[in-house]
Amino acid sequence: MATIDSLLFNISSFIAGLFLLEYGADKFIDHTAIVAKRLNVSPTLVGLLTCGAEWEELVVIIVALSQKKSNMALGNLIGSSVANILASFSLGLLFMKKAEFDRSSKIYSSALLGLTTVFLLLLIAFRGSSFQWFGGILLIVAFVVYVISVTSLIYRGTLTAPEDSDSDSSDDDRAVQATKSKGWTSDKGHQLNLLDPSPKKMIKAQKQSKAVKVINKRPKTMRQHVFQLALGLAALLVSSYIIAHSASTIGHELALSGTVVGTTILSLATTLPEKFVAILGGARHQPGIMVANTVGSNIFLVTLCGGVLFVWGDASQLQVGFTLFEATVMWLSAVVIFGIVLMGGRRWMGVVMLVGYVAFLVVEILNGRELDDE
């Protein structure tokens, strides 16, 4: 009975997390685009530092390491890297007939391919070695360099005052001047209705009253948009933790091995924010945010999360925590997104990627992967 109660509770938590996730993704996608426009920089760069931060993945990995489950942590890292590309980025492509990507997207997708290659080479080179911590230090340093490079690009973009801010203020000034020159306000329009019963004049006054309300509605400040963006990001992180924790417990209740839980259920759960953001980005024709969502997340995974895993992970568990098949799929996924960003995305590409991801999951489950539990 206790097992059934635990299973039902975690399924309910999973569903509740999905609702919070949708709210956070909607807030984030709207205000990221606005903030990027106000800062006069590419939405890709803003997303790389915000949405592209897999903080929930880092929490999951640290918790798994504290529980002496390095194999689950590695499985989650590999599974999430594959899911972000084949199951998240592909969903965004389904909502866009044709996607063209900017220069920032091309630069960082190539950086992802390089960093993924380095991560896998280090994973193979230090397999079972007590010196794996050295590889972890290198990956953490790479993460620091990545953050500095993105931050510097955003900073340089803010040095030039965006024209939109000036136009907003000038529009407000023109609206005020127009109001004064017309010689009417919303209050006067209302008084006109009382003094003159003429239907034509009443209609005209009502239209003028509505026009003044629209003119007097000022655009939101930059601080308000940043707050809304942060609120959406916070909702994404909290919902991701709830979903990841409940999915992990569901996996254990169903007697799945640690690695299978990491590469399938856990990676699917922790990458749900990327799926929501990719869908919204595709539906709203924001290819830059789609790339930032995927590439930024995977760079975070293979650098900071990978570095933490190498430094504090158990070498013997990491040795059996992955197969050549998983490493190959992870590397090919990075090649695929690099090629799509260079050539341009098409809807049929998203379909092919989704089919490939389903095949990956089927192979993982059929393999059993119970060696790590023996």
Language model segments and positions:
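Hydrophobic alpha-helical segments, chiefly the membrane-spanning helices
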Residues: 1-374
